[in-house]
Each structure stands twice: as structure tokens, then as C-alpha cells.
Amino acid sequence: MVDVLGGRRLVTRDGAWVEAEAALQNKVVALYFAAGRCAPSRDFTPLLSRFYEALVDEARPPAPFEVVFVSADDSAQDMLAFMSELHGAWLALPFQDPLRHELRARYRITTIPKLVIVKPSGEVITDKGRMQIRERGLACFQNWVEVADVFRNFFG
């Protein structure tokens, strides 16, 4: 994902800016296409937040995983409200960044919410991340790491 987002800055739900390259290097990345006005997005986001917390905030060492929210909201204010209300402590592509539209086209996003799991190169591991989390919970992450070929010994 560094290949796609390298040189860009991402924003946290608290409004802090981070360099994408440093934040995403050697990680499995989940691109989360969603919007606060969308009931299925509002339904899935708390589950994704718990999944993220278990892998990143509570695990020692933290899992090589990061979520990048790609908003389909109608305004920057709507995006920030959705992030502050329901999102985990993950990252987001700024609302004004035109890459939001390019990513929707690149990953063929036609409905939301959609969770696309990608390798560091941006190559798709699965575009069924939402379903896999719902059906398999944390167990799906090990498969993603193996396919992504990052931190071979993470589960070691």
C-alpha cells in the first residue's frame, strides 16, 4: 500500500497527521470504503473497531495491520463526525484528497461498506474483508498475513 499511498499524509480521528509510508510499511492494510449516512456502514464499523483493537491496541506485539478509511460521505464534516463517533484509532485519507475517487475506481467499489484487504504493494488479498471478519473473526487475519508475506514469523 506504500506504493499507492507513499508521499501522502493520512489523518487520525483526533485530527493528527501521519506520513502514510511510515504508518503502513510492512503492514497488511484494510481499505475501508464507508459513509456515516449508510446504515450497513454504521452497523459494521463497531465490529471493525473491536477487530482493530484486538489486533493492534491490545496485542503484544501489535499485529502488522492498519485500516485506512476512504470516505464516501457527502462532506468533510460528515466524514469527521462518522470517524469521531464510531471509528477505531485507525487512519483516513483526507476528504479533499482526489485519491479517494481513484481508489474507488481501482478497487471497483460499487457498494458500501466494503473492506478491501491489500498487500503492501496494493495488490488485493481479498475484497471480502467485511464478510470474513463477520464469519471468522480474528482467525481471518492469519490468512491475510500469510498471503501478504509480511512478518513471516508473526504467528511463529
Model features per residue range: what roles?
Residues 15-18, 39, 52-56, 76-77, ...:
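Eukaryotic intrinsically disordered and solvent-exposed regulatory patches
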Residues 43-46, 80-84, 105-106, 129-131:
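Short coil/turn segments at secondary-structure boundaries
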Residues 60-78, 86-99:
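Thiol-based oxidoreductase modules, predominantly thioredoxin-like and allied folds used
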